Amino acid sequence: MENNEEFQDELLALESIYPSCLLPISEQSFTYTLSIPDSSVRLNIQFPLDYPNSAPTVLDAYGIDKTLAEDVLLSVATGDVCIFSYMDLLKELVDIDAEQAAAERESKLQEESDKETPVMLNKSHYVAKTPEIQDEPWKPKFDWKESEPITDRKSTFMAHATRVYSTEEVREALEDLYMDKKVAKANHNMVAYRIISPNGNVIQDNDDDGESAAGSRMSHLLTMMSAENVFVCVSRWFGGVHIGPDRFKHINSSAREAVLLTDAAPSQKKGTEHGKKKKK
């Protein structure tokens, strides 16, 4: 092949653009290893003596289907030097495969996130499980942050919030919180959580425990606060007097205060602190 000027010129051009992409295995048998840049694809190719009039032969293929590699080679071997064109087509195929693989991985991650086991948020599910423990002093397992109680026309509102990083921790947090007999005896325990999974998906849910639309409002609040990895429960002890829409103001106010104390929404907390300093 040393006397084949077209082949030698092609080798020099390839080496200048893609160094070491075409290396000899045996110069006597005119076999070379072709490596596709930025990929694991390698091909062992044998060149005929009358190349480029005759097409090279794919002996072995690694990282790509051999039949596909042969078909692509035959499509560009038209009587002129073809390794440049061959590499470009193979690289395009490799890039497409990589994009498809990435898309499939992302789709799989999304499916796994969508398959998260739903959390049973209703109070009765937890309180009924631990009746004998309700008389014991509460020894919380989670780092709960509490809002200041808000009392309006004999109804009292108070929030508890803690950091959670999975739906399993949400379940554990609920079990932990309902060990507090005061919380367990509340007329309504509205809950919401918002988790950002490692792949960036948002996992969230809420329950209003009979206080219509309260859970969804709390969930919306967490989104507006850009809160991450947090669970919040607002308890209401009903005093017998209906207070109308004001209850939603107290629920959101309590939830916001407790969430800020967990540092789950640092940007919101900075804004609040800045506002307080400004008032002074």
Swiss-Prot record:
Q: What protein name does the entry list? A: Protein IMPACT homolog
The coiled-coil regions, if any, are none
Q: Spell out the PROSITE patterns in the cross-references.
A: RWD
Start and end of every RWD domain?
A: 9-109
One Pfam family hit: RWD
Q: Which organism is it from?
A: Schizosaccharomyces pombe (strain 972 / ATCC 24843)
Task: Say where the protein is mainly found.
Answer: cytoplasm
Subcellular location, record wording: Cytoplasm; Nucleus
Signal peptide (from-to):
none
Role this protein plays = Translational regulator that ensures constant high levels of translation under amino acid starvation. Plays a role as a negative regulator of the gcn2 kinase activity; impairs gcn1-mediated gcn2 activation, and hence gcn2-mediated eIF-2-alpha phosphorylation in amino acid-starved cells and subsequent down-regulation of protein synthesis. In normal conditions, it resides in a actin complex and has no activity.
According to its UniProt record, which protein family does this protein belong to?
A: Belongs to the IMPACT family.
